[in-house]
Amino acid sequence: GKWNVNGTSFDKVIFCGNIKDLVKMVDGINVNEYKDSIEKLEYHGTTAVFCEIDKNPYSWIYQPSRKHESHRIICTGNFSKTNNSEDLPDNRMTATIEFTDAISKEDIIENLSRIPLNPKYIDHKYNKYTYPIQDANTRQLIRNLKSSLRVFGLYFTGRFADWEYYNMDVAMGAAMDMVKSEF
């Protein structure tokens, strides 16, 4: 069979999005036996808070604490000078401070007052899907779905496609391994 993606036909398609969306998008293949299990897959979201902080030498700071709800500071200003506005004072840089799940702006600002490096709020965004949560059956479910879709030329890989807590390097490796074994 052929796959029609935005008006173009393909023999094979690799899906790298969220598996919850894939089972809703597929036409012509019966994936009903998987829909309930896929829908029940659990996850955590994060609220990413863009802010300025005191300059420091770190890339990431993991900060488990009972003093605030944040779990990590990503020191984005250290990744590239262009990540920092010219308007920032010399002793300041940009960062993203992460909170598990949704948190209000008021609670963010209140938490920032208790976080090291004197963070100053700029903006925030809640991302619903950040961390996939597995149970004892998740990997087998994904293997079974992959096996049943492979015969139709439909493949998938990625953090939320495979429902695996991949870091980017592992996600890229999984994609390259899939291409080597399937194409």
Regions of interest found by a model, annotated:
Residues 3-115, 120, 141-145:
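Mid-domain catalytic core of redox enzymes
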Residues 82-183:
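Conserved flavin/dinucleotide-binding core of flavoenzymes
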